[in-house]
């Protein structure tokens, strides 16, 4: 079978798919060489048509095959299905497409044979219709033709007789050979059957003995394996139960240890938190006390500084007054000139001021909260030193 496909070919607006196939009956009846040559020729023509035409159509394909001396006819019967039994000539083409689908038979147009006693010129003259002179060669008489026919018939009869004799000889030789081969085959078959029966009996006996031994061995092995399997299963179950119990005990102990560790960690965290809070409270209290002490010390220092300044101012004033009084009481010899009135007024003012006593610093006491004993003692010492230094008799030199 040969195929030739033209994907772009169109026959009345449809694509062509061409397939060449040869019926099986003709392939069996006719010689193979002749059929293959015809199929090859048709396939070559199809390939040439496909290569020569860009868009191959069914009409163009018919023209190409007609020019090559082939005739194309649509196949209507169901030969491709294998139902027809008559002998058909030519090759079968299967064309698939929308409008050109179907089977087509292609065969070579046979040339007219030349009759005996006629030349090609006479045939050409008859076909063309022109009157041409006959050949000078005379025709054979009818008697010769009859003699030739009889000779052919005799020859055919002799050939048939020879064929029949050869067939009879062949059948006799084949029948003798067949009888001999049959006897030999029967003897061989009987010997083979007896040997097979003996071998089968022996094999059956051996197989029965082996099966009995195997069954006994299997039964004993099964019983032993069952008992061993049961004991093994029991030991396995016991070991598994023990391992499970041990695992449970270990897991419980681990859980208890973890719980204890967690409780200890919580207690430690709580103790650390309490210690931190206590330290924070103590630090806050110490900061408060230190701040109070600093405020108290600063206030004391400020009071002392103020008292010292007042004492210095008073001592200076007293020294000035004394100096003035001393200068007034003891005048110098050189200074015998009368003093002006302004000096007299100033001296009178000084006397009046002298008559008035200077203000003494008042001892101030500040109540301090009883926080610690050390700062209170220091405060008392400071007050004592202040009172001693603040006496009117303690004067600094100007």
Curated annotation (Swiss-Prot):
Q: Does the keyword Repeat apply?
A: no
Query: Where would one find coiled-coil regions in this protein?
Result: 241-312
- Residue spans of biased composition, Basic residues class: 137-149, 157-171, 233-243
Which keywords appear in this protein's UniProt record, sorted alphabetically?
ATP-binding, Chromosome, Coiled coil, Developmental protein, Differentiation, DNA condensation, DNA-binding, Nucleotide-binding, Nucleus, Phosphoprotein, Spermatogenesis
Q: What tissues express this gene product?
A: Testis-specific. Specifically expressed in haploid germ cells.
Cellular component (GO) terms are: chromatin; male germ cell nucleus; nucleus
- Stretches for region Disordered: 115-398
Q: Which domain of life is it from?
A: Eukaryota
Q: Which residues carry this modification: Phosphoserine?
A: 38
Residue ranges under compositional bias (Low complexity)?
Answer: 204-232
Q: Which GO terms describe its molecular function?
A: ATP binding; DNA binding
Question: Where does it live in the cell?
Answer: Nucleus; Chromosome
| Protein name per its UniProtKB record | Testis-specific H1 histone
